[in-house]
Design a protein with these regions (language model features):
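Cytosolic nucleotide-utilizing catalytic cores of signal-transduction proteins
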Residues: 1-188
Length: 188
């Protein structure tokens, strides 16, 4: 592989260091390379692999770092700093070569909520996302979104009219959660 647009850095890591400590170190290095306020330099993304213990692990670590860069850009834009272990489900989604398939899945699953042409759709997607993230805990969702409990109950009823009974159908909830994650990916 050519490195015309890549810089590969190997950093010694304490095997007992937490992933957070490693990411702080890498973020500090990226900040220095980027310069204050970017300094007019091109933006760049940084991918971090899992630690390796021998030179034999370099090819796999390189592949992990590249995957972290690729998926990190889709999720966070051109200046992403992403650890391979933080990719989660996005690691699998990135394996789907046809973005059109992902877009169709989002459109079919979210219906009119898939469009970005309305602030109301964005608001309802956010409500749905927090509901799913809190495992349909209405009180916690209302607290996180600063809604009155009854306002949230109204929104849930509206969402269920649009999407189906996601509060009682775990399979539908999984489909919607996946569609929301795909919707967040750039270029989809």
């Amino acid at each position: 592989a050519g490195f015309s647009q890549e810089v590969v850095a190997l950093l010694p890591a304490d095997p007992t260091a937490s992933a957070d400590a490693v990411m702080r170190t890498v973020a500090d290095i990226a900040k220095v390379v980027r310069g204050d306020g970017g300094g007019g330099r091109r933006s760049f993304s940084t991918g971090v692999s899992r630690p390796i213990t021998s030179v034999g692990g370099l090819p796999a670590a390189y592949a992990e770092a590249r995957k972290a860069v690729h998926v990190g850009r889709q999720m966070h834009g051109e200046s992403a700093l992403t650890h391979f272990d933080a990719l989660g489900i996005y690691r699998l989604l990135a394996l789907i070569p046809d973005g059109g398939d992902l877009r169709r899945f989002v459109d079919e699953s979210l219906g009119e909520l898939a469009t970005d042409d309305s602030p109301e759709n964005e608001d309802l997607r956010r409500t749905l996302s927090v509901l799913i993230d809190t495992n349909i805990n209405v009180a916690e969702t209302a607290r996180q979104l600063f809604f009155h409990y009854n306002t949230l109950r109204y929104r849930i009823a509206k969402l269920e009219r649009m999407l189906g009974p996601f509060t009682t159908d775990a399979q539908l909830r999984l489909t919607l959660a996946l569609a929301l994650r795909i919707h967040q990916m750039r270029g989809i």
